[in-house]
Amino acid sequence: MPVDQEKLAKLHKLSAANKVGGTRRKINKKGNLYNNNDKDNTKLQAELHKLHPMTIENVAEANFFKKNGKVLHFNSAVVQIAPQCNLTMIHGQPKENTLNGLYPSVASQLGSQELEYLTGLAHNLENEQTVLDQLSDRCSETKQQVMNS
């Protein structure tokens, strides 16, 4: 059966004007530009609420002493404890400081055992720093000897 080209062109014009349906491309959805962890935070708060923690009032500051000599310092921290689970929670924004920076303000609040521990920790850090300095000096000396050879 022969096809009439004129009728075919006329049908193409009519079909182009009356397009049915849309384009087949996917619409790009924009994700959350500000990724808050509110969803995770609410789940965590819900789980912690199940432990029935007790809030300790009037805590001015809290400090975590790390073994590398850094201290996590919390100003105006909210402290909660759940003794049945042996759990202590500290809520707040920590600032990471050095042990030397916080030592004068913290020393008056500590007992004798804690002071001995902190002085020992500071002494160990100083010893480690001197050992690292000696090793770096030796490395630089050997590099110079290799370069001169």
From Swiss-Prot:
GO CC aspect terms: cytoplasm; nucleus
InterPro entries recorded for this chain?
BTF3, NAC_A/B_dom_sf, Nas_poly-pep-assoc_cplx_dom
GO annotation terms (biological process): protein transport
Please verify whether the record's keywords include DNA repair: no
Keyword Repeat appears in the UniProt entry: no
In the record, the note on similarity to other proteins reads: Belongs to the NAC-beta family.
**Name recorded for this polypeptide:** Nascent polypeptide-associated complex subunit beta-2
**Gene behind this chain?**
BTT1
